[in-house]
Amino acid sequence: MARQVICWCFTLNNPLSPLSLHDSMKYLVYQTEQGEAGNIHFQGYIEMKKRTSLAGMKKLIPGAHFEKRRGTQGEARAYSMKEDPRLEGPWEYEEFVPTIEDKLREVMNDMKITGKRPIEYIEECCNTYDKSASTLREFRGELKKKKAISSWELQRKPWMDEVDALLQERDGRRIIWVYGPQGGEGKTSYAKHLVKTRDAFYSTGGKTADIAFAWDHQELVLFDFPRSFEEYVNYGVIEQLKNGIIQSGKYQSVIKYSDYVEVIVFANFTPRSGMFSEDRIVYVYA
């Protein structure tokens, strides 16, 4: 048996008083049962807030027999709430929150269902994700990102409603070009708003290899070009992302695919003539 674990199943024979949720417990469920030999006992399942030893568990419920949970969360909970041979209960303390087992197959199955990106498992399934210093740096970056995003506020402008309406149409064949020549129209603030509310991919431009490597299949792609970038806009990478297929040659060659990508460009200038088909550009004047 593992020395310290989070999840424990237990049996307490001939209980004298009800159980209660200890401060160290995150979740508790149990019921009174009668065994085949007629013995009365509590059958239950506990999730601790942190890893706890067998000795520690026995201090919480003296006389109980504990075993490390072997099946899934749901199976352990169901076993502690089964109708036969229940006498009383079940009693449940705190909300039962299913989590993903930190195993590669479980994470892969969850990705199929939820569409989550790998980075979203970095905290909950850190062993499956990776055990390395680079993971810690990436996790720290995510914490910094979440803190920054939470502070972003938006002062709405009328042109933003037009973009919102366009996004409701879900047309991956076009490029929305938000043009504001003067500056100060709120283009960057609105781009930040889309990062915060729609998990958009944000870029100020660059080499195709760098952008393709950084893009993690987000459906909404934003290019927020500074005024000084007009002569260096990478029109090819915009087109590739709009098409939902792009080759990344950074570190290792890989082709990334997506069935739907919406691209928005924020700029103080309009695109160079002939770079895109005119019927693919939708202008919004900020």
Curated annotation (Swiss-Prot):
Divalent metal cations, possibly Mg(2+) or Mn(2+). One of its GO terms (molecular function) is ATP hydrolysis activity. The active site is at Y79 (for dna cleavage activity). A motif (RCR-3) lies at residues 79-82. Its main location: host cell. GO terms for biological process: DNA replication. One of its GO terms (cellular component) is host cell nucleus. Its cofactor is Mg(2+); Mn(2+). It is found in: Host nucleus. Residues 2-96 form the CRESS-DNA virus Rep endonuclease domain. It catalyses: ATP + H2O = ADP + phosphate + H(+). Its EC number is 2.7.7.-, 3.1.21.-, 3.6.1.-. It holds the Pfam family Viral_Rep. A motif (RCR-1) lies at residues 9-12. A motif (Nuclear localization signal) lies at residues 50-70, 96-102. InterPro entries: CRESS_DNA_REP, Helicase_SF3_ssDNA/RNA_vir. Keywords: ATP-binding, Covalent protein-DNA linkage, DNA replication, DNA-binding, Endonuclease, Helicase, Host nucleus, Hydrolase, Metal-binding, Multifunctional enzyme, Nuclease, Nucleotide-binding, Nucleotidyltransferase, Transferase. A motif (RCR-2) lies at residues 41-43. A divalent metal cation binds at E33, H41, D84. Homooligomer (Potential). Rep binds to repeated DNA motifs (iterons). Belongs to the nanoviridea/circoviridae replication-associated protein family. Essential for the replication of all genomic viral ssDNA (trans-replication). The closed circular ssDNA genome is first converted to a superhelical dsDNA. Rep binds a specific hairpin at the genome origin of replication. Introduces an endonucleolytic nick within the conserved sequence 5'-A[GT]TATTAC-3' in the intergenic region of the genome, thereby initiating the rolling circle replication (RCR). Following cleavage, binds covalently to the 5'-phosphate of DNA as a tyrosyl ester. The cleavage gives rise to a free 3'-OH that serves as a primer for the cellular DNA polymerase. The genome of nanoviruses is composed of six to eight segments. In addition, some isolates contain subviral DNAs. There are 3 rolling circle replication (RCR) motifs. RCR-2 is probably involved in metal coordination. RCR-3 is required for phosphodiester bond cleavage for initiation of RCR. This is Master replication protein. It comes from Faba bean necrotic yellows virus (isolate Egyptian EV1-93).
